[in-house]
C-alpha cells in the first residue's frame, strides 16, 4: 500500500525537501511475501515498540494488535516533550487521514439505510455544491468522493480562521477549485472530496458531522477514548505532535495542534487511542460487526469498502483504492494519517484475521509504524504490506521533451527541467501547513529512469541509503506526446506549462 503513504515522498527525504513535506501523508510501499509462521505471539510487542522508538528517535507511540480474537497493546515514550507525561493505552493521538475511513463508514451507513446512492450526483444531496467547472459539478457522483476519482484539485486549502472553519464553509470554497481530470476519468488522492462527502452526511441527516461520528461510529462500537471535536481532547490524556530538528537533534513540539478545522472529515481533528482505532478496524475485519457485538454497518457495505474500485497510475504508489480504504496486492487494506508532527498507520488482512494499529506523535513516526506493521503482519500473514521495493536506475535514452514542464495542484508544484540530456525535479509547497514546511523551492534533484516514463529521484547518498525511493511516473500522453500528468505518492499533478 500509501500515500505519503501517507503525502510527501520527496518532501520527507531531507530538510531541503521540506516544501513537499507538508503534503498529506501517503507512503510509497509494496508487498513482499514469505510463508507465515505460528503467528505474532512469537514477538513481544512492548519490546518491539520500545526498541523502535529509541532507534528512530520518536517521542511517543501506541500500538495495538488484533489476531484471531486476541488483542495485545503496548505504549512507549511520552505524549508531550514539554510535559514529559507518559503515553498510556488510553492516550488519544492524532489519526490524521485515517479519519477518511471513519467518514466513509458513516456515508456507507446511509447507503445501508437507503438514504444515499453512491451512483447519484452530489447535487442530488447538496443542491448548492459547485466546483469551478460546471460540467464537472454536474458529473461528480457520491462514490467518486470516496474513491478519489472526482478529479477535484483539492489537496488542501489554507486556514481561514476560526470564524470561517465550519465544514460547510470548506464546501462553499470548493467552487473555486479546478479539475485535475474529468470526474471518473482517473484517480488522485483528494482531501476536499472527503470533506464534501462528510457534508453530504450532515445535510441528509440534519446533524453535525462531529455528532454523527460520535454517535454512529464511536457510540455504536462503545469507544471511550476517541474524539473528533478538538475541545474534547482536553477531557482525555492527549498527545501532541513533534518535529525532530536535524541540526540539533532535539524534539520540537508543534506550534499548531490541528490542521484547518473545516477539513475534519478528511482528517484534521480526530484523535483516538490505539485500542479504540483497532476496535474500529476489527469491525471491518468482522464484516461490519463490532467486538462489542453491535453492528457498525452491513456486511455488504463493509466488503464494498475493501473491494477495489479505482487503480492508481504509475509505479511506487498506492496500488488501488476501495471506498475509503487503501488496498494492497494481498487482499490487505489499510490507511495512513499525517498531521502537524504526527504519522500513524494501520493495516489489516481478512484471511489472517489480523489487524495492527501504530500511532506516533513524531513527523517521522512512519519509520516506527512501517517497521512494526511489516514485522507483525509477516508473522501473521506471511507478507510485509509496507516493504519498499527498490528500482535500479536504467541506462536508457529518454526524450526530455515529453516530460519537462511545471506540474502542479492547488497545494504543490513540481518543476521538471532538462540539462545535458538528464532530467531533474525541484518541488515547492504553496502553503506552509506545518512548522517545518518551507514555501521555497527545493534544490533540483536529478531523475534517473527506472522504467517506461518512470523515474527515481536521485537524493544525496546519506539520505538515499535509508529512505524509501521517491518515484515519479509521467502518465496520460497528450496528442503531441507530452505527458499531461506526473503521478507520485498516490496523487496526480497537472502539467500547467512547458
Which residues are covered by each model-predicted region?
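Short, conserved catalytic-motif segment at the N-terminal edge
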Residues: 36-95, 115-117, 124, 130-132, ...
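Catalytic tyrosine of NAD(P)H-dependent dehydrogenase/reductases that use a Tyr as the general acid/base
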Residues: 93-96, 187-189
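A short acidic/small-residue loop/turn micro-motif
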Residues: 78-81, 363-364, 491
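Short, well-ordered beta-strand elements
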Residues: 345-362, 487
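Peripheral terminal and inter-domain segments
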Residues: 329-330, 370-498
